[in-house]
């Protein structure tokens, strides 16, 4: 028999890429439509949406050759982020600091993804923030705001993530919630959306990426907020409304504890692996530390990841 429809938003980027093939086979796509998924993935369409929503993004351009890439990079000023469009796990994404880097990176990218445009963006120094939200076409539910501890540009699967975000001003949080609402409405999201932001200074908020699907942070944010995001999104996809399901739309109140997600790596098992972190994902697992304070949650997360930290107290008389 023919399926009533397919849900592509729970299978990561791989499932999103099957959307077109499924539609050609006559399978209806449930949840966010294929056309709106495209708007989030296609650079030019997405730029139009950001403009409509009045949301800033790092300046950049779309190129096809190394020459064009160098032109854009020199116009923006180094460092820049270079990446192929439509990628999974940040594959082929690099931070370039000069023209030589660009020649090298474009050579590598063209080996893995021909005929795809390449994005060159200004690399912003700032805090990387991530949000997963559920939208029913009218209302948006944001379980919480997560903050990555490392510099921006480390792949989100490899970064240490903290909920609730520790260093954001109320104004920045309000902007993040408002931008999430605008984007979800503008992309006509039915189900899940994942958005990554960079916050520079006190409260300059830029959008760096939107995924109209479930992301790897969904299990983490569900666990630490107690909101069952996947069952909720599944019900929304088949037509239920957030309010009917007993939830208050908007950014939910922050928990009174701290949860730290820690990536787990297998470098000791993989000989010759490059252990420096960047925009390409290298972790093979993750674990979670929950406590009343950030320090203790971080300590528990390190223990969970198998990293033994030295225990000592610093006394005043120890200092020279």
Feature annotation, model-predicted:
Residues 1-41, 56-61:
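A short, GP-enriched loop/loop-strand-helix hinge that lies immediately N-terminal to
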Residues 1-3, 13-16, 27, 31, ...:
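ATP-dependent carboxylate activation and anion-phosphoryl transfer catalytic cores
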Residues 8, 83, 194:
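Short beta-strand segments at enzyme active-site cores
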Residues 32-93:
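A conserved helix-loop-beta module that forms one wall/lid of the active-site cleft
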């Amino acid at each position: 028999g023919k399926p009533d429809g397919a849900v592509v938003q729970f299978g990561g980027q791989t499932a999103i890429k099957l959307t077109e093939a499924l539609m050609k086979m006559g399978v209806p796509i449930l949840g966010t439509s294929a056309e709106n998924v495209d708007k989030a993935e296609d650079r030019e369409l997405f730029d139009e949406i950001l403009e409509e929503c009045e949301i800033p993004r790092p300046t950049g351009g779309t190129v096809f050759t190394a020459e064009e890439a160098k032109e854009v990079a020199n116009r923006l000023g180094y460092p820049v982020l270079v990446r192929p469009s439509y990628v999974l796990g940040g594959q082929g994404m690099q931070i370039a600091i000069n023209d030589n880097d660009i020649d090298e990176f474009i050579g590598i990218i063209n080996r893995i993804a021909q005929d795809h445009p390449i994005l060159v963006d200004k690399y912003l120094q700032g805090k990387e923030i991530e949000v997963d939200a559920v939208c029913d076409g009218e209302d948006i539910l944001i379980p919480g705001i997560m903050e990555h501890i490392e510099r921006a540009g480390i792949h989100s699967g490899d970064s240490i993530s903290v909920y609730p975000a520790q260093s954001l001003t109320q104004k920045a949080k309000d902007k993040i919630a408002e931008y999430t609402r605008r984007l979800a409405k503008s992309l006509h999201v039915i189900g899940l959306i994942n958005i990554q932001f960079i916050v520079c200074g006190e409260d300059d908020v830029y959008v760096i990426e939107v995924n109209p699907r479930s992301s790897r942070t969904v299990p983490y944010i569900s666990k630490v907020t107690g909101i069952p995001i996947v069952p909720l999104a599944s019900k929304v996809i088949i037509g239920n409304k957030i309010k009917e399901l007993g939830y208050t739309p908007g950014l939910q109140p922050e928990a009174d504890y701290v949860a730290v997600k820690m990536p787990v790596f297998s470098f000791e098992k993989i000989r010759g692996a490059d252990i420096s972190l960047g925009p390409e994902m290298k972790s093979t697992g993750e674990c979670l530390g929950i406590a009343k304070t950030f320090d203790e949650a971080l300590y528990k997360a390190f223990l969970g990841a198998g990293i033994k930290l030295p225990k000592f107290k610093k006394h005043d008389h120890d200092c020279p």
